[in-house]
């Protein structure tokens, strides 16, 4: 959703760089419904941008249950977390309020990062082909 609100931010850069970097951008149906619900609050330009970038997302299955204890994430965010844990290498979010405690240690091996921190990590590891964002 953040990619819809700013043409210059890290979220937008991730969409721009995904193909050349070999990144698959994943979202569950639940995540897409959340974006469709929330993007209009960002205005008409954000709605148009959502229509453009939504087609770049690979749909993954919603995961609604998890086999291990989960206590620090609100129920409304668990489908996002569980789906990412089942299918992704990293969960990117700006939702520090609900995912902040997991941004330090991750979730059962799944790193949870802000988009800008993800780009910094990739650049520092020498995996980011483009040096300027």
Name every feature range the model reports, one short phrase each:
Residues 19-69:
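PIN-domain endoribonuclease scaffold, especially VapC-family toxins
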Residues 29-30, 94-96:
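Short secondary-structure boundary segments
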Residues 1-27:
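Short, well-structured N-terminal submotif of metal-dependent ribonuclease cores
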Residues 74-90:
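Acidic, metal-associated active-site segment
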Residues 70-74, 97-133:
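Acidic, PIN/NYN-like endoribonuclease modules and their adjacent C-terminal/linker elements
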Residues 21, 53, 87, 106-108:
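Short, structured coil segments at secondary-structure junctions
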Residues 2-5, 66-72:
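Short, flexible loop segments at the rims of nucleotide/cofactor-binding pockets, characterized by
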Residues 24, 91-93:
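Short hydrophobic alpha-helical runs that function as membrane-insertion/retention elements
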